[in-house]
Amino acid sequence: RGLIHSLMSHALDYMHKQEMPISFLYPYSIPFYRKMGWEIVSDKLSFTVRDTQLPKPRPVSGMVERVSLDSEDYHNVHSYFALQRHGCLIRDNLSWEEYWRWDNDDMIAAVYYTKEHKPLGYVVYYIANDIFHIKEMVYLNIEANYGLWNYITAHFSMIDQVQGDNYSGEPMAYLFEDSEITEKISPYIMARIVNVRDFLEYYPYQIQPEDFKIHFKVHDKMAGWNEGDYMVSWHDGETFCEQVEDNQSINVVELDVNTLTAMLMGYKRPSYLYEHEKIRTEYYMLVWLERLIPVEKPYFSDYF
């Protein structure tokens, strides 16, 4: 345990010196990484849809075409999707290599194109034992969503069910006419803020109230440079964060780096964390926190 603790401490110190604001990892032990400041920030929702529950075809103007796994259109759709979604990894060449590392050779990619042949979505899948296995399904608008499900439903005679994973943080059942599909939620990726001061200063707050300051009192046993008090303020559209001395300031929000990460990443809302005694503050501060922090859950589907 001492060696692993030392290695993790060294890794954090290296990331801090490299000015990396946040660290992500897939945990082999959630309790272990929680002790070191990492926290769950995204879920994986595994779903099973029976063939009789597949959505009825909807009219769309485009079509779905199979493409190679290194298709530029396919990769470009993911890049655009990642830029739109909170917390999504923008894949470089190494990320794409890791994405395919553990998959079988039967994987297929199919892209939805508009009538102008503009790519707007894709599904990556394989079929085995009468099951349509979805590795990833991404769409940029509802037309692409309909088109991809039309494509999946077209395999009705070949399959008994569809299985896949959804990383949006929202259950899918509501969108099906027969909503009695099977969904299982599991914690997925963990993250931790590496540099609290920088993260608080560069964070995209929803509002920038010039007549208001918020005092974060942060606890971080693993990264001593984060332990302390931070005053966040706004002026002329800019955010400022300075480390201050511990005092009897107003608007204090006290929490550990785990909770700060989960809250700012949007995985859990401030009111939820307050109700479960994860943050210590005056009740009126919850209104401010709810207004400041964007309402959007992270989308993270990669593994490393």
Name each model-derived stretch:
Residues S29-P31, D70-S71:
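Short acidic/polar capping segments at secondary-structure boundaries
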Residues G2-H10, E143-G147:
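Conserved acetyl-CoA pyrophosphate-binding loop and the N-cap/start of the following alpha-helix
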Residues S42-K135, I142-Y146, N150-H155, P187, ...:
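Amide-forming acyltransferase catalytic core, primarily the GNAT-like/NAT-type
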Residues G37-R58, K135-F304:
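Active-site/acyl-donor-binding loops of N-acyltransferases
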Residues M8, L12-P27, S157-Y167:
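Conserved GNAT acetyl-CoA-binding A-motif
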